[in-house]
Each structure stands twice: as C-alpha cells, then as structure tokens.
Amino acid sequence: MVSVHPPIVGFLGPERAEELAGKGLFADDLEGLASAWRTNGQRWTSTVTRALARPPEQLALRVDGEWAFVETLRHLIFVTDTWVGDVIEESTEGYHPWGLPPDFFAHAAGPLGLAVDATPAFDEVLAVREARSSHVAEVLERLDPADLQRTCVPRDGQFLVVGALQAVVFEEWAHHEYATRDLTTIEADHSA
C-alpha cells in the first residue's frame, strides 16, 4: 500500500485519500511520482490550450467565488515554491512575488515577499508557471530513490521528500479539476 503524505490525508480524509492512492495519484517511488507529474503536465497543457482561446479578461473571472484561472496558476507557483523550493531544496532564494497562498496561509504573504494583490498579465503568469513546472521535472530527474526518505526541515515543520512531492502532485491534480470545471462554465457563459 502506498504511504500518503499526512497533511493530504487530513485534508481529504482517509477514505478519499485511499481511493485516490488506488488510482496512482500518490506514488511513493520516483518512477510513479514522475509518471504522475507527466500525467498532470499533459492535462494542464490541454487545459491551458483551451484557456488561451479565451480573451485574457475571462481568465481573471471568478466562478462561484473560487479562484480565477490566472489565480489558480499563481497558486501553483506558490505550491512549487513551498514544497520544492522551501521544503525539498531548503532554498533561501525565496518565493516568486506572484505566488498566491491559500487563505489560511495569507498571514505569511508579507514575510515571504508575496504580492497577493498584484494583477500580472496571464502570459506573464503562465511563463513563471511553466518554468516552475519544468523545475519540478528537473528535481524528479536528479533525485535518487534514497532521497525520497530524506527528512527536510524548512521553516514550518518537518517533511519527507516523498511527502512533499506527493503534495505537489496532489495540488496540481486538484487545482486542475477546479480550473477545468470553472473554465467550462466560463466557456458556456461567454459562448458566441
């Protein structure tokens, strides 16, 4: 049985976490994690292609109070900076200012140098997002199996590398679900 990162289990609940683990979402080996990352990347590539067919202002629209498409990409920049940069690499380079934290972590925006009220253009956010996504793929390439069990001690806790990678894969998967749902609504609401 695959070991799922404890914060994910807490967020999803044990039954849902086990169900998703059974679908290969929470691999605990490099090959499985890299495969899940590639699958997420393919899903996002298709969805971003759909998004690029919309006027940029539509990608800044919120649906039912959820983040806009561009805000979701900004959040995924934050996710990568947190789990890969801060946790796995224990980087001191900091966060990209366009990263968007979840509401429960908004108190840390200032100390992390995040400009949550910024309104960068979609293509600028997409370029940063694509660079972060490529960086995750590079990290997966250079890790070896023993690295997965390394304990990382960033500023806010203690995590295994495998758990941090599971968190990134899960966030990418979950936010793709939300972004796709909302993009479908925007397409329907703004069809010619």
Locations of regions flagged by a protein language model:
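Acidic/histidine-rich alpha-helical segments that form the ligand environment
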Residues: K23-A51, A106-D147
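Short, contiguous alpha-helical
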Residues: M1-V9, A34, T45, T49, ...
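Serine/threonine-rich low-complexity intrinsically disordered regions
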Residues: G13-R16, D28-D29, P55, P101, ...
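Terminal low-complexity, poorly structured segments
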Residues: R16, S133-V139, V161, A179
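Short, charged, surface-exposed hinge/linker loops at domain edges
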Residues: M1-A27
